[in-house]
Regions:
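"…centered on the first transmembrane helix and the immediately adjacent amphipathic helix/loop
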Residues: 1-51, 67
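Membrane-helix interface segments
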Residues: 2-8, 56-64, 87-88
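Alpha-helical transmembrane segments of multipass membrane proteins
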Residues: 15-18, 49-50, 72, 76, ...
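Short helix-capping/hinge motifs at transmembrane helix termini and TM-loop junctions
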Residues: 23-24, 55-56, 82, 109
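Interfacial helix-loop-helix junctions of multi-pass membrane proteins
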Residues: 27-37, 74-99
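Residue-level signature of the transmembrane alpha-helical core
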Residues: 41, 46, 64-72, 91, ...
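Membrane-interfacial alpha-helical segments at the cytosolic side of multi-pass membrane proteins
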Residues: 42-60, 98-108
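Membrane-embedded catalytic cores of phosphoryl/pyrophosphoryl-handling enzymes
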Residues: 47, 52-80
Length: 109
């Protein structure tokens, strides 16, 4: 049951990341209170932790790689939206957050 709960939460978190990354910028105003880099890093750190918790036998660094890949894909997709653009800094923030989440999970195992 615990795995199902974390899988549902993970899916919702992914949906929120996709919306926040691809929605028109006007729809996500006010999300930059703590700084864009911190927001990206937190989002992907949380995603990594949630994904690890949703696995029976977690492979932490594979999960980190999947989170980094999602972040890169979303950054690339932003270049196809009207008022968004892909950013290397955002991709680095996503990867940093995923690595922090993975390190936290590895430390807590």
């Amino acid at each position: 049951m615990r795995l199902i709960v974390f899988r549902v939460i993970s899916a919702c978190w992914i949906a929120a990341l996709v919306f926040g990354s691809l929605a028109p910028a006007d729809d996500v105003q006010g999300a930059y209170v703590f700084g864009d880099f911190v927001l990206h890093a937190f989002g992907y750190a949380a995603l990594t932790v949630l994904l690890v918790l949703s696995q029976r036998h977690p492979r932490i660094w594979v999960t980190v790689g999947a989170a980094v890949a999602l972040g890169m894909v979303l950054e690339i997709l932003q270049s196809f939206t009207g008022d968004r653009s892909a950013s290397v800094i955002d991709a680095v923030a996503n990867a940093t957050g995923a690595a922090i989440g993975g390190a936290f999970c590895w430390w807590r195992r």
